[in-house]
Regions:
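Structured, non-catalytic alpha/beta "coupling" segments that mediate domain-domain communication
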Residues: 2-24
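Charged, flexible boundary elements
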Residues: 23-54
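Covalent nucleotidyltransferase
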Residues: 45-173
Length: 174
């Protein structure tokens, strides 16, 4: 006898499937987001080391860089951002091909050389520039973190943030 004769849909998400079948069963594109430190400060050890960076109000982006060339620039949701030729050229000039295949995690922010926009205006102008067709001129990329491509895909780094910061980010500021 047939008990169920209908197709049933499910609301099972990728996080549950990855929990059941193992991390990476379904690849998830994700980046770490900032959070208010007040809620977590009590969980840190007294001698814990952490970094504080300025809030920029730009657009989070991931740059895939491989042997001297930018492969892609994506939003934090994984959507490719086009029209950043000038920025791509700047990144390729600034970063050595010796770094191999890496991911740069940072924030896109339209340059405000005259310092005339409020934070909100700058955010709005950056968003407008990114979302329109054509080339985006005057776009900057502020790097928060950098790690090897394979480690980004695995979601685990062999180095601490402090070590990555020393290895990569200091090199970029030269």
């Amino acid at each position: 006898a047939q008990v169920i004769g209908k197709s049933w849909t499910t609301t099972v998400g990728t996080s549950l499937l990855n929990k059941v079948y193992g991390v990476g069963f379904i690849p998830v594109f994700d980046v770490q987001l900032a959070f208010p430190y007040e809620k977590k400060i009590s969980s840190y050890k007294a001698d814990a080391r952490f970094f504080v960076t300025q809030k920029l109000d730009g657009f989070r982006a991931i740059v895939e860089f491989d042997n001297g060339k930018v492969v892609s620039i994506k939003t934090r949701k994984g959507k490719v951002i086009d029209g950043l030729t000038e920025l791509i050229e700047d990144i390729e000039r600034a970063i050595s091909a010796d770094f191999g295949h890496i991911i740069l995690d940072g924030e896109l922010l339209l340059e405000d050389k005259e310092n005339k926009w409020t934070s909100g205006e700058r955010f709005q102008k950056t968003g407008q520039m990114i979302s329109t067709d054509g080339e985006c001129e005057g776009m900057g990329f502020h790097i928060f973190d950098a790690l090897p491509y394979d480690e980004f895909q695995a979601g685990v780094s062999k180095l601490t943030y402090t070590e990555r910061r020393q290895q990569y980010l200091e090199q970029f500021n030269k």
